[in-house]
Amino acid sequence: MKNFYKYLVAIFLITVIALPVQKVNAGNKDRAGQAGADELLINPWARSSGWGGANVSCIRGIEGIFNNVAGLAHTPKTEIVFSYADWMRGADIRLMSFGLSQRVGESGVFGFSFMSLNFGEIDITTIDLPDGGIGKFSPRYLNVNISYAKAFSNSIFGGLNVKVISESISDASASGIAFDAGIQYITGELENIKFGISLRNVGIGKMKFSGDGYSLQTMVPNNNNQFTTTQRGASFEIPTQLNIGAGYDFLFDGSRFTLAGAFISNSFKKDQFSLGGEFSFKEYVQLRASYTYEEGITKPITDPTRTNAERGFAGGLTVQVPLKKESKSVFAVDYSFRPMENFSSVHTIGVRFTL
């Protein structure tokens, strides 16, 4: 088991070191907006999104699939999560997610989740009919994750995730495959010192749109023959991300306060620093808040150095009740709040069953 863990760490570190070879320049602000599939950077979950990314070292359960899949290994037995958000309320963008994790054996956990973005209905326009009136179409994004995490000891946890990415409109679509990997390490006499590292969205090749939308039918000049031309869509990379974090649990009589922070290295946007805390009262009520900083985030939205609509703050609340006193089964309602600049804030609500 120890040798297996050493090999896992070695492979993980080699992957991190090899990123420059793949031309992934972390924290390069000049590359902002040049990647696709940016929905991979949106946390869809109601509980963990209140942390703002600071909880890479202490995330637990199915929501760990988002920023550190190693957290999946802490699933007691079975966990089911539903979440919903109006992304930038008023823009008619609906964000829905579902996750299911199941412990297998003494130390392994399988996980499955998906996130769907629905942009509502948009008028179809053409060159001849720029004002529409000929119908509507609905863009859709869908990300599906299949994960496995394992507890290698009482202190060491690791996980891998495979994600399938799909983006589509009525006459064009793009798809891709990416991988995540993560490790968590817990130490201290009370197991209250935590470290975590995760590598997210390592794509296999690039994504590219294709379909009938890239074809154009026209007439040959001075001829009655019709011909079709097909354009080639430009390929694009997905936003790889490296997260490194640490956390500490302050334990009181029946309560807990967790302080955690993380450095978030982005391949197609500015690097970020996230700090957050969570207070848990007897595991029945949990309050959390965080702040994620990046260069220019405090400047007006019209400033050219600002490239993020989020204000950096996030917060959340969880209320959970036990289903069985003799087990860890709980039913919980999670909520998070993320304010935006010049857009309506994002409110996410979810329900969670731990069986």
Describe each PLM feature range.
Residues K23-L355:
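Subset of outer-membrane beta-barrel
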Residues T15-V24:
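C-terminal segment of classical bacterial N-terminal signal peptides
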Residues M1-V9:
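Bacterial N-terminal signal peptides that target proteins for export
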